[in-house]
């Protein structure tokens, strides 16, 4: 049974609260080029979901949300331990760690058009999580003449600069929601595809359906430290560039030595311009 099939079973045991309902659900494939520890540059793909109505939206990784939901209660944690116990013999036998239930993406983006605010929750590194709010961006779009079809919808090309990257997107006026993946929004139609110039990041819609699914808030909000956007990005970058050293120090602390014996001087790293979705934190 997959993680996503288990989610309704878990949620059915919880007391229902009244949350706003979406009108549309869009699945996106997020392709990312990233720096993986000392291994250098790698690529990966994650599924993200956009739930949206005319006033608010939520962009999130569904598998990660399911695991966050389990981690938010004692019974959920016990259920996760059972799932882990069930796969560990096969993991030990084959060395296939992909069998271990793990998060696929971390960022949650909530847009509230009524209040003109965006709320972002993200993983920083190790046991650190951060969140921030900012005004809903008034992106300056340049709409072009090029067209193409995505998922059967006629789309128009548009471009914008946002927080250090230049984006080319395709939106469809056939779905008049000023929404899109991640923070991208503000066009007279739903954004179904977005790619930034370097090719390090892209979002491509893979499915779309009408829904009345609830837009539920994030699980365990208290674990997210409030901070400014650029501070969060700088801390993510520090963790990325010093991952091995931070892990070794944490290992020392777990052992109780606190000596820092496993800490190392930073290695000479591969020079690369691979970076996050937003790069203006470096200024």
Descriptions of predicted regions:
Residues 58-59, 155, 169, 192-194:
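Short hydrophobic-aromatic micro-motifs
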Residues 3, 43-45, 143, 153-155, ...:
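Short beta-strand-initiation
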Residues 130-173, 178-180:
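Extended beta-strand-rich segments in extracellular/periplasmic secretory proteins, especially
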Residues 33, 43, 166-168, 177-212:
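Structured soluble/peripheral alpha/beta segments that form catalytic or ligand/cofactor-binding pockets
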Residues 22-27, 153-159, 186-193:
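Short, hydrophobic/aromatic-rich segments at coil-to-beta transitions
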Residues 13-133, 137-138, 144-147, 199-283:
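Extracellular or lumenal secretory-pathway regions
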Residues 3-13:
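Hydrophobic h-region of N-terminal signal peptides that target proteins for export
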């Amino acid at each position: 049974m997959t993680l996503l099939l288990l989610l309704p079973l878990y949620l059915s045991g919880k007391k229902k609260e009244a949350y706003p309902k979406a009108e549309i659900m869009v699945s996106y494939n997020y392709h990312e080029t990233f720096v993986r520890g000392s291994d250098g540059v790698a690529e990966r793909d994650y599924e993200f979901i956009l739930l949206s109505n005319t006033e608010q939206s939520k962009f999130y990784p569904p598998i990660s949300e399911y695991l966050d939901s389990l981690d938010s209660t004692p019974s959920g944690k016990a259920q996760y331990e059972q799932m882990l116990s069930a796969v560990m013999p096969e993991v030990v036998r084959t060395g296939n760690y992909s069998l271990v239930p793990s998060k696929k993406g971390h960022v949650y983006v909530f847009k509230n058009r009524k209040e003109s605010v965006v709320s972002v929750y993200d993983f920083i590194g190790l046991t650190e999580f951060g969140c921030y709010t900012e005004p809903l961006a008034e992106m300056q779009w340049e709409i072009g003449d090029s067209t193409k079809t995505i998922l059967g919808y006629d789309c128009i090309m548009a471009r914008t600069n946002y927080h250090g990257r230049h984006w080319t997107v395709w939106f469809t006026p056939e779905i008049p929601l000023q929404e899109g993946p991640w923070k991208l929004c503000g066009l007279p139609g739903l954004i179904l595809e977005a790619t930034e110039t370097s090719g390090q990041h892209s979002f491509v819609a893979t499915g779309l359906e009408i829904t009345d699914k609830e837009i539920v808030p994030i699980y365990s909000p208290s674990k997210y430290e409030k901070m400014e956007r650029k501070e969060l990005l700088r801390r993510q970058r520090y963790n990325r560039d010093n991952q091995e050293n931070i892990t070794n120090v944490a290992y020392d602390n777990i052992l109780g030595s606190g000596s820092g014996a496993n800490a190392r001087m930073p290695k000479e790293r591969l020079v690369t311009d691979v970076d996050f979705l937003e790069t203006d934190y470096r200024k």
